[in-house]
Amino acid sequence: MAYDRPIDTWVFRSVMDKQPRMLTVALNKDLYTCYNLQSGNLYKVWKGGVNYEGAVYTTAHGIQPTSFGFAYVQDGSQQTQWRLRSGAGEEIPEINYLGYSFIDGQVGINLELISKTGKSVKIREIPEYALDEGRSGLVRSFTVLDGASNDLVPVLNYGTDQKLIYKEILKGGERDENGIGVQLSKNAVVKTYFNPVPADWAAPITDDTGMIANGKKIVEGSDCSACHLLKENLVGPAYDSIARRYPFDWATVDVLADKIRLGGTGNWGTTPMSAHPDLSRSDAQNMAYYILSLDAEPEPQERVVDIALNTPDVTFDLDNDDRRGGDNKDKQAGAAVSLYLVNDSGDLYEDLTKSTLPILNGIAPAIHLPTSGVLGEINEHFYMEFKGFIKSDETVNKTFRLISDDGSVLKLNGSEIIDNRGDHGAVAVDAKVGLEKGWNEFLLQFQQGGGGYGLSLQWSDDGKQFTVVPDSVFYHDASAFRKLLPYVAKKVSTVPGDQMPLNAVHPSFDMFQAKPSEFHPRIGGIDFIDKDKMVICTWDATGAVYILKNYNTEDPESIEVKQIAKGLAEPLGIKMVDGELYVLQKQELTKLVDTDGDEIIDEYQKVCDSWNVTSHYHEFAFGLVYKEGSFYATLATDLGSEFKEVKDRGKVVRISKDGSEVEVIAEGFRTPNGIAEGPDGALYVADNQGNWIPTSKIVRVEKGKFYGFKHADWERVKDYKEDPPLVWLPHVEISNSPSQPAILNIGPYKDQMIHGDVTHGGIKRVFIDEVDGVKQGAVFRFIQGLDAGINRTVWGPDGNLYAGGVGSGGNWRHEGRLWYALHRFKYNEKSTFEMLAVRAKSNGMEIEFTEPIASSEFMNIDAFEVQQYYYEATEDYGGPKLGVEGLKIKSVNLSSDRKKVFLEIDGIQENRVVYIHIKKPIKSDEDQSLWSTETWYTMTKKPVDRPGVVNP
């Protein structure tokens, strides 16, 4: 039988209405249900839908999905609705959620009710939509799978608002005299049909963060009620009349927002609507969005803001040259560009240009800068103007789209047509205007605050398909330029890998795409079924699992992609064990089972969820490692001091294969995004900077140790002493958001490790040193120039390295890159000249290279720079380098094979980061340039009686 489900992923796990471990089942466009899997309760039955909000849906941090619409049934209590009845009376059982399965197009939800005696009853519920005389109904079909007897009978206690119930039909069940409990037989069906939604019902606001809630606040706080009421026409139409008349889509939101701001007459009569010029476009859009929601029409899908349009950045030079000379009547190709530094008062737009002059100018062929950083060293706190003419060969209507991060304004022929002001991410604003034949004067104003930036001016003939406004239409004359203030650019290194990121793949590896071009996975986990099949999970709105066949081909378009599961809650770990597939969701370890051999997952079996959770968006679960019969995973913490007493967060945990045991191995982690087994068999974890974590780090996990983060279980751990990491990763210099480590044991890189980075991008390499039993080491740049920030690194059965990328809003991305990637790296056996290892000596530091240094190179103390500093954990977010000290090099000593350099240094201290920079460009005997010039060594323990060799 075919069922009319309203959405593709109609069964999905998430937080819902600020409650964790929820399962939403969208049975029909007129009936949604949601189950609380901790209590086993049917939480809600409603007509409406879901506000898909949060990092994987809208990139917004801090919010989670919420329901909207009319509730027929709602039970927000945490006490279970289930009872077990026996000869001894009735008891409240322990609830053990077992999982759910798909059965002939329906979903079965499995629970175990456990008595105090240890006996239990296993029950499956299949919910379904039904219709009776035009009334929506919920059919709940229960099957007792195991354990029920005359001595142990399941009873479902639930109450309903009888005013909302049209009729109820019980089959195989008997309702108690109190009208609440229903005693279930082995097979029971409860059919409940609901009365229509009351005509006077208005959609309640179920959240306080979305556009509906914000719009309602603005409307209620404005003067709109002088002309409009909710359900009655006044001077203007009633809000609900507007909602019924117009479609709830983004185009209508934009049209109504412009009408609110600009005023004028429309389709409701001759009385003009008052203009509200002081209202921001964002507020007007929120108001329009709220008004259009009042007829309970589903919200439009997230507005797609494609700033890149698969088109490269249109780059141009900015300089301090005076371009004011020349004939103002002589029009030249391109738009005139002026760049201003924002003043201390923070003025922008006309307020800024009236008070100061630009520092740089240039000529832009077109206006398309989706990648932050392409303007050179100035990346924050600036203002730009693009000025000139748009030439049109005819009078024509065009829809302009201005996308900017942060704010922007577009003026055409003296009129402001787009207002995209404000500090925000990449936001698109459209305006349909007429271009006159000939020269159309324009001014585009752009302001950049902090963080990344982006800007693109696009247009369309039909308002649907947009392209970058081409360089063939832009012109300027000399009048567009102003006098410049003096400006001297900073002198910076221009050599990739020399105090700046690399820009390419490591020469010892060849990179291939491990996915077809039209497949855009935001990788949460990677593993392999066999040598022919890769399996991945994706951290996105779908929460999917895919099989990739032929993944190691050199023709990525021939790779076959098959979705086998979906509806998982932010999965960030996946593992094949003994031919069985396991995935780590945000709040559960789950076994995925294909029962009929078609590779599509039929059963989502809970293995374990025996750790505390809340609805906080930052409670990620990362994994997975499997060794010696157990899984190992990491649990991220909540953020903010109000969550100091949340237990079980910030832990490395061991989970037995059957899920019956959960053991805390170590604690004190913040965002431990990645866990792996190292070359010595120990577990290694990448943790991210934040409160109590002054900078990111790689940790070698030791049982029972505490690694610094104190906001989880505050009272117990607040006085704990922090154990040191394997390596500190200085923020911005070598790391921002480190991710899953992996062993590197190929070519000259024996028993080393690598890890990705979501925000800094690329892959880093770690050499592990050991001093008196203490593991410590050095970190190096390794691979860069990838499609996205790297979230997972895994070696395949073919001996190749696979790296999966991810991205989201804010700083959860590698700036200027995509939000998805899947790369394959094949070792090509070519040698790369770089630092292979750095070892601590009692009298200095020894650097080992992969190749001999060229005999023509003269190594002296001027070729090196060495510093040391330390970090201190505080409650503040991150922390600065402390005690920064330049170290004097006494001598530089080259080994006889010219592959090792020993720097004789006095004054190196324990518990410091020792930074070494090779200032002088050097080459190898093979005439290769040095791949990267820096390393950061974590000196937890300084060796004694392990001197480096000082040449006579």
PLM feature spans:
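Short, surface-exposed alpha-helix to beta-strand junction/turn motifs within ectodomains of secreted
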Residues: 852-891, 916-923, 933-937
